Swiss-Prot record:
Coiled coil: none annotated. This is Dermaseptin-H3. Expressed by the skin glands. It is found in: Secreted. Keywords: Amidation, Amphibian defense peptide, Antibiotic, Antimicrobial, Cleavage on pair of basic residues, Secreted, Signal. Possesses a potent antimicrobial activity against Gram-positive and Gram-negative bacteria. Probably acts by disturbing membrane functions with its amphipathic structure. Residues 30-40 have a biased composition (Acidic residues).
Length: 69
């Protein structure tokens, strides 16, 4: 009976250790994905602001050209 208890505790302990390792790896992967998403959203924001600035400059130039005629 004592042998059965020891082996059961060993199995439970090893299962908990492997579970905690898997959870840690999962958290690391989620953190990496979040960083990549943040970087991509920053790039998109920068791209949109550049497009907006170019469109505003083109609009001003077009209005200036129409005003001169």
């Amino acid at each position: 009976m004592a042998f059965l208890k020891k082996s059961l505790f060993l199995v439970l302990f090893l299962g908990m250790v492997s579970l905690s390792i898997c959870e840690e790896e999962k958290r690391e992967n989620e953190d990496e994905e979040k960083q990549e998403d943040d970087e991509q959203s920053e790039m998109k924001r920068g791209l949109w602001s550049t497009i907006k600035n170019v469109a505003a400059a083109a609009g001003k130039a077009a209005l200036g050209a129409l005003g001169e005629q």
